[in-house]
């Protein structure tokens, strides 16, 4: 039986590719997709979900827009990474269908309530929608199998010296998620910076030759430009968000550890930092499965294999 999932995302190039990977994988049943503000403004991220589902010919999947700002802060966006539309680069279709009239939290709650088995929530943007769901529907916690997030880092940040972007946008929401008691799987920068797509990989995807693999290659062409800056020291572009879906499909290509994670919400220099108790110094019981390494070639091969689904 396929694993039921809800995807909460803020497309974003890597979010879009995570959607492509999920919808090419029969092991997963995508029951709903919700959008969050983050990589771009909330109107643009919602539109990008609809554009991607139009491209992938999946108007059957319920879609709803989420919170327009973080729980306690003003919104920060990453237009310097993802461009004016949030998905700059390829020519994507205009949406062929409309989102549902309700909110992301309402759609998530309805999906959980109606599911015959616990649902995995995959969150590839700020955690605002997920935190609002957890706070407003404690009766549904048992219907959530786990929450798989792209966010955080044990080491260096990518938005501040200490913080990864998704967590930095809404650290209060992320703290709610980590301390919820629901199993959390964290794909942080420690692993996603190793999941780099090289120029040769982009050409491999392009050579698959179907319309979707071509779009993915064009998304990566644009995404690669930001990551060419020498300060990063990257060979390619780190494909953050698809690590969440790849872990669900092939956990064996990842190395993980069980650790306690908390989120700094007040530090002068460390707001948004995920504090990972790697050496068990706090006495707190582990609350997260933390990804620390990935077989990069296995990750690339999985993407290439699933892109052939769209032939």
Swiss-Prot record:
Transcription regulation found in the keyword field: no
UniProt-listed GO biological process terms: nucleobase-containing small molecule interconversion; purine nucleoside catabolic process; pyrimidine nucleobase metabolic process
Keywords: Glycosidase, Hydrolase
Xref: Gene3D superfamilies: Ribonucleoside hydrolase-like (3.90.245.10)
Family in the record: Belongs to the IUNH family. RihA subfamily.
HAMAP family the UniProt entry points to: Pyrim_hydro_RihA
Protein name per Swiss-Prot or TrEMBL: Pyrimidine-specific ribonucleoside hydrolase RihA
Source species: Salmonella schwarzengrund (strain CVM19633)
